[in-house]
Amino acid sequence: FHDIKILFTKKGTKIFKNLEVLKEKKFFKKIGISIYDTNCLNYINLNYNFDAVQCPYNILDKRIITTGWYDKLKNQGIETHVRSIFLQGLLVNKLLYKKNYFKKWKKLFINWFQSLENDNISPIDYCLSDLMNYDFDKIIIGINNSENLKEIINFKTVNKNKMINFNISDTKLIDPRSWK
């Protein structure tokens, strides 16, 4: 389910039950949901037996971890698939944060890119190294060009001592749906 709002309706319940029947008949192996924040998981987890959750995770947005849902899902045998590793490119492209919408966080991004430069660390290496702290089942990565792909394939793990603990709760920054 890409738009989970339907799961809060009678129609959604009916659709889910039909999907469970098809799953039992081996038409597919897993039923998954895609979320933007963890607030919906209490209701959905109580009312539906899904197999996978696709959610955002990056150095700024660790809500799946900080809310305890990562551990809960793991303990229930539910797969965690993470996306938005580079926050729609914002964490790896210096030009993006200069857009007017991100003015409020300009200092954060200047410090981010400057600290990486000072330590001779690529943003892609840093973001991917941060993922290594968890046992995510799948990682969905977007790229803009072949150089990005090469860097991802050849990424070098960043020393944990050089990792900064960001935890941003401002959804106007970490939820791309709010970007204008």
What are these regions, as identified by a protein language model?
Residues 2-180:
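Beta/alpha (TIM)-barrel catalytic core signal, keyed to glycine-rich beta->alpha loops juxtaposed to Asp/Glu
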